């Protein structure tokens, strides 16, 4: 063992959790001295980063912790994606996370890259107790307005969620005609892990729908802007007119 190289030392701690890796490295330092210092420094930085992320995550668990202390067991976070775009549906998600789960990187979907959201989408679906999705299309948005369509999508998401939750954490809204206690949290996607998880599920689900629509209507660039009112999108509407997934009530000002 006394002739181990730096690479061999590093390989010997691969796969261990950070505390066990550091414990082993501190022991190896007595034998290998300076050869271990850079590896120790690397793992200490990893641990600091992990602890910082864990503390951030725990700050987003405050609402959940209070609800658990009050006796609630199944907390569903609810959020939507797609209230503002000129095209496509509004999508809502309802997510119940296990009480002690730690999903590293979980955050408000708007603060994440597309690649981060896609990875977290799979992790959330794997670890969640339940996930429900509700989709309201552009025609219904035109008929009942975007606020009512958003609430309808959220109700559909709750209806598709199993098991039935004890309480709903909703980002900024209250829902009518639902016989479950609700807690409306302003900017909840940045304050509650349950709502943040729902925001990611809703956003990724909607983005995938718009990428599919891009194949059908490639001239609008839906895969890039996801239906939002970018300069590219508005110019395409002026040039080609609207397509079947455009919201008439949102695009009438751009139609010549």
Swiss-Prot record:
<keyword id="KW-0540">Nuclease</keyword>
<dbReference type="InterPro" id="IPR012337">
    <property type="entry name" value="RNaseH-like_sf"/>
</dbReference>
<dbReference type="InterPro" id="IPR036397">
    <property type="entry name" value="RNaseH_sf"/>
</dbReference>
<keyword id="KW-0464">Manganese</keyword>
<dbReference type="InterPro" id="IPR024567">
    <property type="entry name" value="RNase_HII/HIII_dom"/>
</dbReference>
<dbReference type="GO" id="GO:0003723">
    <property type="term" value="F:RNA binding"/>
</dbReference>
<dbReference type="Pfam" id="PF01351">
    <property type="entry name" value="RNase_HII"/>
</dbReference>
<dbReference type="InterPro" id="IPR022898">
    <property type="entry name" value="RNase_HII"/>
</dbReference>
<dbReference type="GO" id="GO:0032299">
    <property type="term" value="C:ribonuclease H2 complex"/>
</dbReference>
<protein>
    <recommendedName>
        <fullName>Ribonuclease HII</fullName>
        <ecNumber>3.1.26.4</ecNumber>
    </recommendedName>
</protein>
<feature type="binding site">
    <location>
        <position position="79"/>
    </location>
    <ligand>
        <name>a divalent metal cation</name>
    </ligand>
</feature>
<keyword id="KW-0963">Cytoplasm</keyword>
<dbReference type="GO" id="GO:0006298">
    <property type="term" value="P:mismatch repair"/>
</dbReference>
<comment type="similarity">
    <text>Belongs to the RNase HII family.</text>
</comment>
<dbReference type="GO" id="GO:0030145">
    <property type="term" value="F:manganese ion binding"/>
</dbReference>
<comment type="function">
    <text>Endonuclease that specifically degrades the RNA of RNA-DNA hybrids.</text>
</comment>
<dbReference type="InterPro" id="IPR001352">
    <property type="entry name" value="RNase_HII/HIII"/>
</dbReference>
<feature type="binding site">
    <location>
        <position position="171"/>
    </location>
    <ligand>
        <name>a divalent metal cation</name>
    </ligand>
</feature>
<dbReference type="GO" id="GO:0043137">
    <property type="term" value="P:DNA replication, removal of RNA primer"/>
</dbReference>
<dbReference type="GO" id="GO:0004523">
    <property type="term" value="F:RNA-DNA hybrid ribonuclease activity"/>
</dbReference>
<keyword id="KW-0479">Metal-binding</keyword>
<feature type="domain" description="RNase H type-2">
    <location>
        <begin position="73"/>
        <end position="256"/>
    </location>
</feature>
<feature type="binding site">
    <location>
        <position position="80"/>
    </location>
    <ligand>
        <name>a divalent metal cation</name>
    </ligand>
</feature>
<keyword id="KW-0255">Endonuclease</keyword>
<dbReference type="GO" id="GO:0005737">
    <property type="term" value="C:cytoplasm"/>
</dbReference>
<keyword id="KW-0378">Hydrolase</keyword>
């Amino acid at each position: 063992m006394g002739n181990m190289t730096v690479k061999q030392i590093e390989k010997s701690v691969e796969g261990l959790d950070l505390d066990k890796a550091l414990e082993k490295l501190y022991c190896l330092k007595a034998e290998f001295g300076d050869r271990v210092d850079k590896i120790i420094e690397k793992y200490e930085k990893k641990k600091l980063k992990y602890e910082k992320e864990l503390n951030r995550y725990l700050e987003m668990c405050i609402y959940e912790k209070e609800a658990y202390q009050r006796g609630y067991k199944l907390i569903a976070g609810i959020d939507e994606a797609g209230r503002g775009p000129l095209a496509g549906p509004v999508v809502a998600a309802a997510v119940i996370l296990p009480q002690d789960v730690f999903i590293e990187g979980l955050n408000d979907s708007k603060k994440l890259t597309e690649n981060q959201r896609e990875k977290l989408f799979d992790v959330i679906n794997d670890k969640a107790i339940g996930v429900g999705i509700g989709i309201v299309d552009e025609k219904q948005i035109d008929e009942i307005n975007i606020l009512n369509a958003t609430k309808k999508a959220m109700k559909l998401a709750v209806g598709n969620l199993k098991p039935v939750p004890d309480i709903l954490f909703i980002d900024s809204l209250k829902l009518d005609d639902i016989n479950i206690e609700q807690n409306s949290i302003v900017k909840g996607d940045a304050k509650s892990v349950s709502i943040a998880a729902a925001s990611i599920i809703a956003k990724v689900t909607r983005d995938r729908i718009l990428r599919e629509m891009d194949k059908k209507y490639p001239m609008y660039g839906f895969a890039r802007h996801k239906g939002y009112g970018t300069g590219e999108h508005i110019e395409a509407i002026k040039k080609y007119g609207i397509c079947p997934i455009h919201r008439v009530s949102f695009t009438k000002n751009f139609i010549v």
